[in-house]
């Protein structure tokens, strides 16, 4: 295993530049002015270094399927679900694995090393779950992949779905998912939530439920999730994804709910790409923004993180697996442009997501696994503004990706000038 010395790094929360000595796959020493005989010295010249990004919400079974068999012309969640049902006819394990592996590589090149994907566990042959379990094993040297057993067709809409969910957990999924707001009735939605908690308790698994992903101010299954979490003592292990309906809740109810979520130590995942594109399609004007109450949740100390959700699939036609791009989008449409909030955006794709995924040994600290990224930026603000490339991605002490940034040369007034979109002393 190689030894690496990272020189002149700007660590988050530190004013002075520092060095990081990597040996035997861990951070052996961190501090200024380090000098060791090593296999490689990387002088990052003041660039921002960070723990790797964590993408806490993906659907790797559906990635790269946009337009197959048809495009989502309405842009709605429901049409996306219908297209996925059509796509499943004849979908092979080989296609799922190829597409998932490609997007995982995109994620790594963009600085992600810890991913959580939902896998369609109600697909009757088990092909989807088996494919992603194989990918998890095949890609383990590159990424840590958590798999959620996700009931794409709900749990109580057809007989046999409960058995399929349990089988997915027996096969080795890491978390149990749910879809209560899409069940046939509110009563079945509550049964959905309780079933998920029961199954998670049985297998000692985490929970990540697609919850209230609509604009209905009466869709309040997240409240049931908070109750079950508190009653069962599962604080910190439960995640509610989306919760876009919270945007439209009565403010008095939202105030009470946020108190429950804090007591339950719930993790919340917002998915800026899909939420901004899919939600409020029937609003007309004025049109709501279609995201959960990110600012209020953060202000109350609730753990909120960002997921990519969909990448070129029936629900969202764009994307390249970049958590930093998701953070930049959320800054705009959740109005998180205050200077301290920009740092929070980076937290939402690093330490907050790591907390959601219950990761251990995460972060730039002596003794931790040497997992880190070097961004082509000098500050968190510029990382968001520029949506910076990852110059280096280091996994267990090995450089697994190197990026050479684009070089732009402007020719004007008889001179050549390099353009990098950064401020200089003359701008101040």
Where are the regions that the model predicts?
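Divalent metal-coordination and catalytic microenvironments
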Residues: 9, 25, 46, 57, ...
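Histidine/acidic residue-rich metal-binding segments in metalloenzymes
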Residues: 127-141, 157-267, 284-306, 362
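Alpha-helical scaffold segments that flank or form the walls of functional sites
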Residues: 66-118, 126-138, 163-170
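His/Asp/Glu-enriched, well-ordered alpha-helical/loop segment
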Residues: 206, 227-238, 274, 278, ...
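Active-site microenvironment of metallo-dependent hydrolases
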Residues: 1-18, 22-28, 32-34, 343-428
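Active-site mouth loops of central-metabolism enzymes
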Residues: 83-98, 148-159, 180-187
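Active-site gating loops and adjacent loop-to-helix segments of metal-dependent hydrolytic enzymes
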Residues: 64-96, 172-175, 221-239, 262-267, ...
């Amino acid at each position: 295993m190689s030894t690496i010395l990272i020189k002149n790094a700007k660590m988050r929360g530190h004013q002075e530049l520092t060095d990081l000595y990597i040996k035997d796959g861990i951070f052996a020493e961190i501090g200024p002015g380090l000098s060791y005989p090593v296999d490689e010295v990387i002088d990052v010249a003041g660039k921002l270094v960070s723990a790797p990004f964590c993408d806490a919400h993906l659907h790797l079974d559906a990635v790269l399927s946009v337009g197959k068999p048809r495009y989502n012309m309405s842009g709605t969640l429901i049409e996306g679900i219908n297209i996925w049902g059509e796509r499943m006819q004849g979908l092979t394990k080989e296609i799922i694995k190829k597409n998932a592996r490609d997007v995982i590589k995109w994620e790594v090149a963009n600085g992600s090393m810890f991913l959580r994907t939902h896998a369609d566990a109600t697909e009757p042959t088990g092909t989807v779950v088996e494919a992603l379990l194989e990918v998890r094993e095949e890609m383990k040297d590159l990424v840590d992949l958590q798999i959620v057993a996700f009931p794409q067709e709900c749990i109580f809409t057809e007989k046999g779905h409960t058995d399929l969910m349990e089988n997915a957990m027996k096969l080795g999924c890491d978390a149990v998912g749910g879809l209560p707001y899409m069940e046939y009735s509110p009563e079945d939605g509550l049964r959905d939530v309780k079933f998920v908690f029961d199954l998670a308790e049985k297998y000692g698994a985490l929970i990540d439920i697609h919850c209230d992903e609509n604009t209905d101010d009466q869709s309040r299954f997240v409240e049931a999730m908070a109750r079950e979490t508190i009653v069962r003592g599962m604080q910190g292990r439960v995640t509610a994804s989306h919760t876009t309906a919270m945007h439209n809740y009565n403010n008095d109810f939202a105030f009470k709910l946020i108190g429950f979520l804090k007591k339950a130590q719930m993790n919340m995942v917002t998915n800026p790409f899909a939420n901004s594109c899919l939600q409020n399609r029937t609003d007309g004007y004025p049109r709501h923004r279609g995201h959960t109450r990110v600012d209020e949740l953060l202000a109350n100390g609730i753990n909120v993180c960002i997921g990519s959700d969909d990448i070129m699939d029936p629900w969202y036609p764009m994307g390249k697996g970049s958590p930093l791009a998701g953070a930049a989008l959320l800054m705009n449409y959740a109005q998180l442009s205050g200077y301290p909030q920009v740092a929070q955006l980076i937290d939402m794709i690093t330490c907050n997501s790591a907390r959601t995924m219950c990761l251990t040994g995460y972060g730039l600290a002596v003794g931790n696994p040497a997992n880190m990224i070097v961004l082509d930026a000098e500050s968190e603000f510029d990382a968001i503004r520029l949506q910076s490339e990852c110059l280096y991605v280091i996994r267990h002490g090995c450089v697994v990706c190197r990026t050479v940034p684009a070089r732009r040369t402007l020719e004007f007034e008889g001179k050549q000038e390099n353009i990098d979109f950064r401020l200089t002393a003359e701008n101040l």
